Amino acid sequence: EDKRFLPMADGETLLSRTLRRGRTAGFRTIVLAAEGERRELTELAAAYGAHLVTDDRPQQGPAAAIAAGLAAAETEWSLVLSGDMPFYDFDLVRALLPEARGAVQVVLPTLAGYWQPLAALYRRDAGQAFAAAIARGDRKLGIILRGLTVRELPLAVDAGLFFNVNTPAAYRLACGRIANEGRERPILSVAAPASGTGKTTFIERLIPRLAVHGVRTAVIKSDSHGFQLDTEGKDTARFMTAGARATAISAPNGYFIQKIEDQRKDFQNLISKIEYDIDLFITESRSRGALPTLMLDRGLAAPEIDARVTALFQKDAAPHDGLLSYDLDDMETAARITLFLMGRPLYGADGIMFLT
């Protein structure tokens, strides 16, 4: 399947999201460089006022797209951006522009030592060098760039800005983060196919790791048995037994409210009742998880891996097709993934996993 047209959690496709955000950022001209024409590309170009160009030599990868795009450029300098970077911040161009001077042909941002050639500034004449390289059989960006005058610019920014959707597992991550973009406050579901898997312990270990990053959490648990908060015979229990539909207790260190309902309220309903000093809502459930969900697996039952599942944490982790899989005790990675899904910035070592 062509990843450019994969549906994201906000209803857009990966490519249409990039085009919309580029247009909103105020770029005067947008050139959509593609390997060949197809109806979806023509329609997207028309919708966002982009100039659609195609590669002179198909199947040559990004190098051919750069050559074709720069040949059609109307300005001396252009931002070359891959269409699969859903979280790129177009304001980064302001940091690159001062370096676009003199003999420089490419302003190449680097992050944690990684080149970002598909989020770089290129001078128009660099396109000729790409075309010449392709003609002689060179299509690797690294080889071509070494023949140009390149100004490397180390950046200390959120690694998520350069995250690209190169794999089905990365697509799941992107959908989870975009789902949270559309919410007033982000949600993370922790689910497991069977009791005894360790959902509570997993969340208990995750919370302090998030707190180090300043994340204030609330946890909402699904219960299938019914519950009574107070001890039988105590005041609030007696009020409920007498027929009160709700009771509340206020104390110097907090409060709780218990309300009887005729049917289970969904998590969103409960979230709306919690005060706004919370940064992340974690929901614990066996089957009622929302996107994004971290699925836990201890081998007690087969986990249901549907579109809501963003990553799998399992005992004796093994590779899982199209899904990130980690050891059930790898809480540092769980925290990094959670921060990414929240849209929180990740720097240095914390962000490297989202660059590769």
Question: Where is each model-derived feature located?
Answer:
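Walker A (P-loop) phosphate-binding motif
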Residues: 182-225, 347-356
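Phosphate-binding/switch loop-helix module in NTP-utilizing enzymes
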Residues: 259-289
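Short, charged/polar "capping" segments at the starts of alpha-helices
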Residues: 20, 36-43, 227-229, 301-305, ...
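Phosphate/Mg2+-binding loops and adjacent switch elements
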Residues: 280-346
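Nucleotide and nucleotide-moiety/phosphate-recognizing core
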Residues: 1-138, 146-160, 169
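Short internal beta-strands
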Residues: 30-34, 108, 219-221, 249-250, ...
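N-terminal phosphate/diphosphate-binding loop that engages ATP/GTP or pyrophosphate donors
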Residues: 205-262
